């Protein structure tokens, strides 16, 4: 019982810290909360969180070629040229504050291309578990965290996965656009959703 209370107090303390960071970020950007009810976490706030514990950031892939009139990069099942530019811009901004992270993607052309352009040369590990959503995605995240408990993790996945996580963890309706993301962390074997990543 005492152990449970300590764990509960620690979780509450972390949540209060997260709220404070989100509020501070909100003063300098737009609002601390998105319209969907998720806390907004920008690069600087994310960097502060990463100093407390490793973070897991899941991004939707960049603009799909087969659903756009923009020029394709190559394969029609991949992303557009505009998508590569957007992914590189996001990656540059992200890496400026979180330079050290392990990179993963699902096994589709569009997520692999997005992760490749985001990383600018960082090693990419393709993991088909990030194509399927549901409780399986939590198991995959915890597995990666167990293998490298001190590393930040970036995962390129799909909109339905992000929508599922937001609804399951915070009962939030999240309809991610290209390259939108969620910030999570693992604590004592449980996966927590901290908020929505916003790039400024």
From Swiss-Prot:
Keywords: Hydrolase, Periplasm, Signal. It is found in: Periplasm. SUPFAM superfamilies: Phosphoglycerate mutase-like (SSF53254). Transmembrane segments: none annotated. It comes from the Bacteria. GO terms for biological process: lipopolysaccharide metabolic process. One of its GO terms (molecular function) is phosphatase activity. One of its GO terms (cellular component) is periplasmic space. InterPro entries: His_Pase_superF_clade-1, His_PPase_superfam, LipoPS_heptP_Pase. Its EC number is 3.1.3.-. Residues 1-25 form the signal peptide. Pathway: Bacterial outer membrane biogenesis; lipopolysaccharide metabolism. Belongs to the phosphoglycerate mutase family. Ais subfamily. Catalyzes the dephosphorylation of heptose(II) of the outer membrane lipopolysaccharide core. This is Lipopolysaccharide core heptose(II)-phosphate phosphatase. It comes from Escherichia coli O1:K1 / APEC.
